Every structure is written in structure tokens, then in C-alpha cells.
Amino acid sequence: MPMVTRRLRDPDINPCLSESDASTRCMDENNYDRERCSSYFLKYKNCRRFWNSVMIQRRQNGVQPSMPTAAERDEILGAMQKMPY
């Protein structure tokens, strides 16, 4: 597996792995009809936007690593009581 693909499949690096998988699975199941999967695409886009804003905020505050690990992300989402995306 190429290094780029391996990094994208790593849950510590890609916070929206499940949303990405869901949108890909929807495309496969619906014969690549994009309109049927628009809700999955929107959820993935909102996920990326949310974690990008978290990453920017952490970088501004000097927190390393700028992208929280998978365990830290679970804590953040648990503290919010609901999914922000």
C-alpha cells in the first residue's frame, strides 16, 4: 500500500475516516449516482471543516500535535454531547 494511502487510512491522521468510508460505500451501492449520496458528502465536508477549525485553534494556542489523536477526538466529541457535524 502506498505511503499516502496508508496515511489516509490511519485513524490518528484522518479524523473523518468513517465519513469517507460511508460516502465511498454509498457511491458503490448506488452505481456512482452522486445525487443519492449527497447527504454523505455533506457530512464528510462538515466533518473536515470542523476538524480543520479545531486544528487551526490548537495551532494558534501552541498545542502539539495540531490534529488531536483519535483518543483525544473521542474525548472532544464526548464532551460536546452530540456530533457537531
From Swiss-Prot:
Residue intervals of the CHCH domain: 13-55
InterPro entries reported for this sequence: COX23 (IPR051040), COX6B-like (IPR048280), Cys_alpha_HP_mot_SF (IPR009069)
Highest taxon above the source species: Eukaryota
Motif (Cx9C motif 1): 16-26
Motif (Cx9C motif 2): 37-47
Compartment(s): Mitochondrion intermembrane space
One GO term describing the cellular component: mitochondrial intermembrane space
Intrachain S-S bonds: C16-C47, C26-C37
Any Pfam family the entry gives: COX6B
Keyword terms: Disulfide bond, Mitochondrion
PANTHER family membership: COILED-COIL-HELIX-COILED-COIL-HELIX DOMAIN-CONTAINING PROTEIN 7 (PTHR46811:SF1)
Subunit structure: Monomer.
Annotated family: Belongs to the CHCHD7 family.
Name of the protein described by the UniProt record: Coiled-coil-helix-coiled-coil-helix domain-containing protein 7
Organism: Mus musculus
